[in-house]
Amino acid sequence: MIRKERAILALEDGTVYRGYAFGYRGETVGEVVFNTSMTGYQEIMTDPSYNGQIVTITYPHVGNYGVAIYDMESNKPYVRGFISREFSGEYSNYRAQQSLEAFMQQYGVVSIQGIDTRALVRRLRSGGVVKGVIAHRSFTHPEDPYGEFTPAEEQIYVQRARDHQDIDGFDMTKEVTTALPYAFPTLRQGKRVVLMDFGIKHTIIERLAEVGIEPIVVPAHTTPAQIMALQPHGLFLSNGPGDPAPLEYAHKTAWEMMGLLPTFGICLGHQILGLAAGGQTFKMKFGHRGGNQPVKNLLTGNVEITSQNHGYAVDLDSIPNGAFVATHVNLNDGTLEGMAHSRYPVFSVQYHPEASPGPHDSRYLFDRFIEEIDAFDGGNGTPIIKANPGRLGV
C-alpha cells in the first residue's frame, strides 16, 4: 500500500478536512471558494482575479492533461492554494510540457486532495465563503510526514484562518497590475485602445487584438491625462481580484473618462464603472465561478451560457439618475450581469466573454466594442441603447 503525506484544510468556522498533500509542500492561507468548471484548471490557477483565494474544483479529477505554457493567463499562478478530490500524477497531452504537480512545485502552489469536496462546496454554498488554511504535515513534521495532525495542531490552523485579513476593503490589484505600460504586438494596424490593468488575462488582450484593436496595457493607477496622452480610440477596464470599493483612484479615473472615449468593462471593470457612476457594490454569499452560468440578454431575449469569476456584484438601483440601464441578468439569482450608459458609449458585463475556460456565446461583445469605437463621433457619443438597441445583441 502506497503511503501518502498527510495534509489538512482548516476553516475559520472550526471545520477541519483531512486529506493528502499535493503540489508544493508548505502552508497557505486565503479565502476558500469553488469553481464548477470541468476543465481549465491551468487558466484558473493563472488568472490574477483569484489572487488571495484558495480554489476548490468541483470536478472530481484534475490534472490528467498536464500543463501547457501557451494556456497560461498570466506569467505565474495567483491562487493561494488548490483543492481537488483527486489530482492526477500522470498526464497525456501532446501540447503539455509538465505535470500539474511539477507546475505547482515550480511556482509554490500548496494543494490538498482526498477530501470530500462535495461536502466542502455544500458548506460554502449554504454558509458563504470562508477563510481557510492548507497545511502539509511534511512541512511541520518532516521527520513524520505520514502521521496525523493532533487536535491541538488543527485548532492552531483554525485560529490562523480566523486571524487572516479579509479581502473586503483591501486593494488587491496592486499585487497584480503591470508596473509599466506596454504595447501588445499585433499583425495589423488597428484602433488604439488603452487597457487599464487591474489583473488582466492574456486571453482578453488576444481577443481584443483579434477584432482589430491595438492594445496598450497600462497600470491600474494611470490617470486620465496619461490615458489621453496616448491618443487612444477607446478605453477598456479589465478584470481583477477582490473588492472594488477601495479602488477609489480607479473610480475617479473611470468617472472623468466617461463620455470621452468608448469604454468597455469586464468583471472588476464592470464594478468600477458602477461605483464611478455613484452606485454601490455588495459581496455575494459564494459568488459565481465556473463556465456554466446562464445569462439573459435583455436587449435580444437570447440566453448565453457564460464563464464567470466574481464574488461581488453591482446594485443597479443604487446608481443615481438612471445613468446605467441593465442589459444582462443572471438567470440563477437575478443579479446584474451587464449594463450600458443611457447617454455615452460605455457598457460592461460582469462575466468573461473571452471564455478561457468556458463557452464562446458572448464573444460578440468584443465586436460590439470595435463597432462603438468606429461609430464614436468625437465626444458626443451616440447612446448605445436608445439609438439602436440591437447593437449589444447578437
From Swiss-Prot:
InterPro entries, per the entry: Anth_synth/Amidotransfase, CarbamoylP_synth_ssu, CarbamoylP_synth_ssu_N, CarbP_synth_ssu_N_sf, Class_I_gatase-like, CPSase_GATase1, GATASE
Keyword Iron part of the UniProt annotation: no
Gene Ontology molecular function: any one: ATP binding
Glutamine amidotransferase type-1 domain segment(s): 192-379
Entry-linked PROSITE patterns: GATASE_TYPE_1
TM segment ranges: none
GO cellular component assignments: carbamoyl-phosphate synthase complex; cytoplasm
Annotated L-glutamine binding sites: 49, 240, 242, 268, 271, 309, 311-312
Key word Ligase present: yes
Pfam name, any one: CPSase_sm_chain
Native species: Deinococcus radiodurans (strain ATCC 13939 / DSM 20539 / JCM 16871 / CCUG 27074 / LMG 4051 / NBRC 15346 / NCIMB 9279 / VKM B-1422 / R1)
Reactions mediated catalytically: hydrogencarbonate + L-glutamine + 2 ATP + H2O = carbamoyl phosphate + L-glutamate + 2 ADP + phosphate + 2 H(+)
Protein name per its UniProtKB record: Carbamoyl phosphate synthase small chain
Quaternary structure note: Composed of two chains; the small (or glutamine) chain promotes the hydrolysis of glutamine to ammonia, which is used by the large (or ammonia) chain to synthesize carbamoyl phosphate. Tetramer of heterodimers (alpha,beta)4.
EC number(s) stated in the UniProt entry for this protein: 6.3.5.5
Keywords per UniProt: Amino-acid biosynthesis, Arginine biosynthesis, ATP-binding, Glutamine amidotransferase, Ligase, Nucleotide-binding, Pyrimidine biosynthesis
GO biological process annotation, one example: glutamine metabolic process
Active site: residue positions: 267 (nucleophile), 352, 354
Similarity section: Belongs to the CarA family.
